[in-house]
Every structure is written in C-alpha cells, then in structure tokens.
C-alpha cells in the first residue's frame, strides 16, 4: 500500500505525506540507515524520540545475516527488530556491485562470493523481491545495476537498459508474490541527461509506486550531482514520491528538496558521529580537536537533543579521545536529531511558502562556523 499526496509547494520544494502499511510519513523525510536491522548506536526508542519516521534496512546484509529463515520466523523485519514504523529496504544491488572483484554479472543476475564465508551466491530480480517480501518492508526497491561515478555513454546506456529489463522482472515477481507493500523503480543513466530520461520513461511504462534516483553520490564531482538533480526535476512525475538514494550532507538535503526530492537516506550522520564529526546549524564540529578540551558549551546551544541538553563539548571531547562508546552514542543522537530537525524546518518553510528564504538563511548559518 502507498498513497502519496503533495499538500503544498514552495518553488520546486514539495510538502507531502506518504501513507504506508506501518504508518504515515511526513515529507520531505530523512531515513536513518539500519544496515543490519539496527541504526548504529541507537535503540528504537531513541530513534522514536528524535523523530525518525522511517528507517532503511539493507537487503543484502540481512539476507546473509541473520538470514531469511530467522526473520521469517518472527513474521518480518519489524517484529524482529522491534520497530513499528515504516521500513524501506534496498534491493541488495549496490552491495553486490561493490564486490567487483568477487562477482560475475549476466542477464539473469549476479553470481558472487559471500564476503562472510566465501560461499557462492546468486542474486536476481526475483530473488531480491522474494527477500524483501519476507522482510515485509513498507517500501521495496527494484534490483538494478549500479555504474561507477563516471563511465562512457555506451557503457551507461547498456547498464541502464539491463536495469530496465530487471525493473520489469522485479515488477512481475513483486506482483506474483502478492506483496502488499510499495515498489519503487530506480532511475539510472550516470551523468547523461538523455540516458536518465530514457531510464525514467522505461520505468514509467513498467509502473512503480515511487521513483528513486540512483547512481549519484558515487564519486562524481558535487557540481555534477547538483546539475543532474536540477535537470531531473522537471522530468520526474509530479504524482509520485522522489527518493534520492545515499545522499548526503545537510547542504545536499537542502539542494535536493529545492529540486523536488521527497526522501533521502545516508550513513553520513551516523558514520561521521562515530568518527567525531558532528553537524550543527552553525557548521561542523570535529570534537577531537584540542580547542574543545575545556569548552563548557554544548555542541549547539539552540539544539534540544539529549546530548546538547546535558553535556559539554569538553565531555564529548574527552569521551572521543579515550574511545568511550558513550561518546559515539551521544554524537549519533545529536547528528540524527539535527538531520530530523533540518527536515522539520524544511517542511515548515514549505508550508509557509518561504523555502527560498529558508535556504538562504540555512547557507548563511552554516557558513558562520561554530564558535
């Protein structure tokens, strides 16, 4: 089930709702990444407290561990991990294609060695749909082929055409399995506008509940990613949710929303938090820096997260320097809260038709740098 409604626009930005089997999501939305069924360093209660509406699970990794049999015994991923809100699962394609020296790609699918024990495994559109049906994720992604950051036109076209054939197979398998959830197609085509259009037109013929933009933030220069988003803005169907996969920084989120993107996911706020890189409205904090060793201020005096309400930069600096796990947890709570707050602010700005003003204020604040 999926019902998507756009309630308000401001320039190219859209404010909507996404009704799914496990609840309604307010868009634009950021999805924390829970690779193995867990958002690193966060409990489901903490995710709920910071305002997370939907999380992402990784089909490839959950297939390998704990395996479908275990998840199926629990009745699906929601029950297994104790999360009652929506979940999106990727198709497993990106992880498989990252194993470039351990895989063989054919029209049927991809044969590869398990990175865990070396077993020979095979992933096809049909198998990906079966896995995601067992997981019972609210949003299922088609299996596609991912190209590196920059390839020639012919290579990109050959790849996207196979992805379109796999899109048709994903759609058929999804329907044959009588999966009651939503299925998204993925636009590929590298950095070539004509190929992106070809991909999108093919997906529209197949018929999907939402459209994802894949193959960006994979090593291409940032201006090229922004150019492609701008060019895609007017091509994407207005009545379907637009999902930018694997992106990104706070600036990327604002730029994406300005270009009609409704959904994002990225490991950046959690991964950076564990490495002591913290995002705030005033710029980024590298908490390991000696300048913070006796700083009594919170990370952001205007932030309402648990870390900022209770702890100083000096304490977070200390925790990071001695390698205490609490430091990684507090940094993660803050970063994810900041990302959720940024999305809340963008939703409010769109509702009040002042998104462009918000965008200018956001850039000015982030440029000021942390005091």
From Swiss-Prot:
Q: Binding residues for substrate, per the UniProt record?
A: 90-94, 144, 188, 215
Listed A to Z, the keywords are: Glycosyltransferase, Metal-binding, Queuosine biosynthesis, Transferase, tRNA processing, Zinc
Give one GO molecular function term. Answer: metal ion binding
* Similarity section: Belongs to the queuine tRNA-ribosyltransferase family.
| Enzyme class, spelled out | transferase
| Complex and partners | Homodimer. Within each dimer, one monomer is responsible for RNA recognition and catalysis, while the other monomer binds to the replacement base PreQ1.
The active-site annotation reads: 90 (proton acceptor), 265 (nucleophile)
Q: What is the lineage of its organism?
A: Bacteria, Pseudomonadati, Pseudomonadota, Betaproteobacteria, Neisseriales
- What does the UniProt function comment say about this protein? Catalyzes the base-exchange of a guanine (G) residue with the queuine precursor 7-aminomethyl-7-deazaguanine (PreQ1) at position 34 (anticodon wobble position) in tRNAs with GU(N) anticodons (tRNA-Asp, -Asn, -His and -Tyr). Catalysis occurs through a double-displacement mechanism. The nucleophile active site attacks the C1' of nucleotide 34 to detach the guanine base from the RNA, forming a covalent enzyme-RNA intermediate. The proton acceptor active site deprotonates the incoming PreQ1, allowing a nucleophilic attack on the C1' of the ribose to form the product.
Q: What is its EC number?
A: 2.4.2.29
Known SUPFAM superfamilies for this protein?
tRNA-guanine transglycosylase
Which cofactors, by name? Zn(2+)
NCBIfam families given in the database record = Q_tRNA_tgt, tgt_general
- A cellular component annotation (GO) from this entry: cytosol
- Where on this chain does Zn(2+) bind? 303, 305, 308, 334
Catalysed reactions, as listed in the record: 7-aminomethyl-7-carbaguanine + guanosine(34) in tRNA = 7-aminomethyl-7-carbaguanosine(34) in tRNA + guanine
Please state what the protein is called: Queuine tRNA-ribosyltransferase
Q: How is the cofactor bound?
A: Binds 1 zinc ion per subunit.
- Name the Gene Ontology biological process terms: queuosine biosynthetic process; tRNA wobble guanine modification; tRNA-guanine transglycosylation
Give the region (RNA binding) as residue ranges: 246-252, 270-274
The pathway that the record names for this protein is:
tRNA modification; tRNA-queuosine biosynthesis
